[in-house]
């Protein structure tokens, strides 16, 4: 799912959801970046584009099973961990990122 799947006039949901995916799940309630750092992961992030949302990380081989478990957990058990506070916080972050992009040369073209 990407931004092309959003109704006209109601954009930003895919990007907001991408951000929420890093805020913990029902079984792993801490910030997802914390778990990745503890595993020795590098190059971790998420991106949202017109036709997709990506999540990626590079983990040491001994941490692969744990990383795959965390991925499956956040894909299946995110909803119960989303609080109004997390939603409000990430909404502000995404709005800020959009403003920064709009202020770049060509930012409003996309």
Where are the predicted features?
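Short, surface-exposed glycine/acidic/tryptophan-bearing loops
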Residues: 110
């Amino acid at each position: 799912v990407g931004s092309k799947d959003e109704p006209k006039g109601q954009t930003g949901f895919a990007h907001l959801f991408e951000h929420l995916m890093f805020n913990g799940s029902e079984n792993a309630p801490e910030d997802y970046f914390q778990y990745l750092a503890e595993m020795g992961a590098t190059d971790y992030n998420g991106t949202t584009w017109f036709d997709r949302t990506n999540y990626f990380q590079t983990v040491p081989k001994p941490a692969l099973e744990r990383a795959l478990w965390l991925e499956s957990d956040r894909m299946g058990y995110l909803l119960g961990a989303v609080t109004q506070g997390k939603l409000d916080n990430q909404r502000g972050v995404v709005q800020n990122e959009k403003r920064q992009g709009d202020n770049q040369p060509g930012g409003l073209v996309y």
